[in-house]
């Protein structure tokens, strides 16, 4: 299939094989294929030697990432590779890809036809499509959640276009939609796959509300949808795959994380699991975790080596990180901080967000731990008690004095991390305050340019690129140099 025949993506992709939904409009010639309609993707290569290489896996991952971008509510994606006479079927979800193992399509043609026909006959649930929301008028969808203050369920209509979604596979997959009750905007519905070892965000928000915290979002409703353990139930995982290395200049769809809000978002790099390798499993869906970041270092961009060993978690105890898909509806809705309209508004928003952080820490006894431009919103002071900004997203927060979560993925937003946090020092409130300072620098250096230098071309290469590229130690060293006397003026 040529690139011009595939639409619905910001990047030009050429997919060898795909399975798509039937056109909903009668008379559609089907000449164009849209990523939002793709159900299964496949890669076709001439040589059987390509069947179990990083290059083949990464090519499939690129396709899968495009499917996730076009279908942000997708739970998992089926993919397969046919290399010469060899075939391998894959499933990608937010905890990593896993495969069926390799077989010869000539020697086992029955299995080949069974897999292909199986793809064609799968239900929406078996394909990993959005089955937890219901189609509504004007291309929108509805979802039922549990009310936070009343025992009754609440029916909310979601705006068709997400406010925010992630450009990644192995991640929390955070996606946000405006949520309406009738024609009135109630708040924001946030869908995310969080580790089962972390305390649910709704619990922390309700605890903060009970303790009188000011300046954070209020819970309207919540719902637990499904978990990776549910999706993988019945699978038996074998030993990890050993992938061959082949030269490639492609960036990893597994290691690179990019977020978007509306038309543009800044790049966000999340701290990854220190070691997740592919596994084989019995049944047509088998297991594979993300290869070590270090194994990609010569062929992938934005790869980060972790200096952290997950506390209270033995990487040999579990073959994958069990994530739980939850929907959280909060109020009020706001604009991301980088959409500030004036320097004064930027400073007022940051001031109120810092006040909210102070209240969260001192009154709520909760440490946020993920201060970034993605987690500060601009609000209407006339509607939220005079506050121009609020602090959101407690996915990675923890109650002061509690032990380590033991979650496999110790995540954070790379460019805003405090220097000591990058060097594996325990996270404190001071590190969050340091992150607020980096948010201010980021707004001025990255977003302020196009706001105040209209008519001039923004430099293609930013000095701040080194804030999210390389190992943790390299980023910390470079960032420290920027913060020292003589270095700060350069940025």
What are these regions (language model features)?
Residues 420-431:
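Conserved end of the kinase activation segment
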Residues 361-380:
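Catalytic-loop of the protein kinase fold
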Residues 1-316, 320-324, 329, 337-341, ...:
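Intrinsically disordered, low-complexity terminal regions enriched in charged/polar residues
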Residues 351-362:
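Short C-lobe core helix of eukaryotic-like protein kinase catalytic domains
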Residues 335-349:
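Activation segment of protein kinase catalytic domains, centered on the conserved DFG
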Residues 375-392:
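Conserved protein kinase catalytic/activation segment
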Residues 406-421:
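Conserved activation segment of eukaryotic-like protein kinases, specifically the C-terminal portion
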């Amino acid at each position: 299939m040529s690139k011009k025949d595939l639409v619905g993506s910001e990047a030009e992709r050429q997919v060898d094989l795909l399975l798509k939904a039937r056109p909903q409009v009668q008379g559609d010639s089907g000449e164009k294929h849209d990523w939002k309609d793709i159900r299964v993707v496949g890669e076709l290569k001439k040589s059987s030697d390509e069947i179990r290489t990083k290059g083949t896996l990464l090519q499939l991952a690129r396709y899968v990432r495009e499917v996730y971008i076009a279908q942000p509510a997708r739970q998992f994606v089926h993919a397969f590779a046919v290399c010469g006479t060899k075939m391998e079927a894959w499933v990608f979800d937010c905890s990593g890809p896993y495969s069926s193992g390799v077989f010869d399509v000539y020697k086992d043609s029955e299995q080949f036809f069974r897999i292909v026909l199986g793809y064609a006959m799968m239900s929406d649930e078996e394909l990993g499509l959005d089955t937890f929301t219901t189609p509504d008028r004007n291309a929108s969808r509805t979802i039922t959640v549990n009310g936070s203050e009343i025992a009754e369920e609440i029916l909310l209509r979601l705006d068709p276009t997400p406010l925010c979604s992630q450009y990644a596979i192995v991640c929390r997959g955070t996606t946000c939609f405006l949520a309406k009750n009738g024609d009135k905007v109630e708040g924001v519905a946030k869908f995310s796959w969080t580790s089962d070892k972390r305390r649910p965000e709704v619990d922390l928000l309700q605890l903060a509300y009970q303790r009188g915290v000011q300046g954070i979002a209020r819970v309207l409703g919540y719902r637990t949808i499904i978990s990776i353990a549910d999706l993988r139930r019945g699978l038996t995982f074998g030993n990890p795959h050993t992938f061959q290395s082949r030269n490639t200049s492609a960036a990893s769809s597994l290691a690179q994380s990019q977020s978007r809000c509306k038309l543009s978002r800044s790049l966000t790099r999340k701290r990854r699991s220190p070691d997740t390798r592919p596994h084989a499993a019995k049944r047509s869906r088998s297991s594979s975790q993300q290869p070590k970041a270090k194994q990609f270092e010569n062929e992938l961009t934005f790869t980060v080596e972790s200096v952290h060993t997950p506390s209270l978690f033995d990487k040999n105890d579990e073959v994958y990180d069990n994530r739980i898909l939850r929907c959280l509806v909060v109020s009020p809705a706001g604009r991301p901080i980088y959409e500030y309209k004036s320097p004064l508004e930027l400073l007022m928003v940051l001031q109120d967000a810092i006040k909210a952080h102070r209240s969260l820490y001192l009154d709520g006894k909760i440490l946020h731990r993920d201060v970034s431009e993605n987690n500060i919103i601009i609000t209407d002071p006339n509607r939220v008690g005079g506050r121009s900004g609020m602090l959101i997203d407690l996915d990675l927060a923890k109650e002061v004095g509690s032990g380590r979560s033991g979650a496999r993925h110790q995540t954070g937003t790379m460019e805003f991390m405090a220097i000591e946090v990058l060097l594996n020092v325990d996270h404190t409130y001071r590190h969050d305050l340091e992150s607020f300072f980096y948010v201010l620098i980021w707004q001025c250096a990255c977003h302020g340019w196009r706001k105040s230098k209209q008519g001039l071309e923004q430099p293609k290469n930013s000095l701040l690129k080194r804030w999210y590229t390389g190992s943790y130690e390299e980023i910390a060293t470079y960032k420290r140099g920027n913060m020292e006397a003589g270095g700060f003026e350069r940025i």
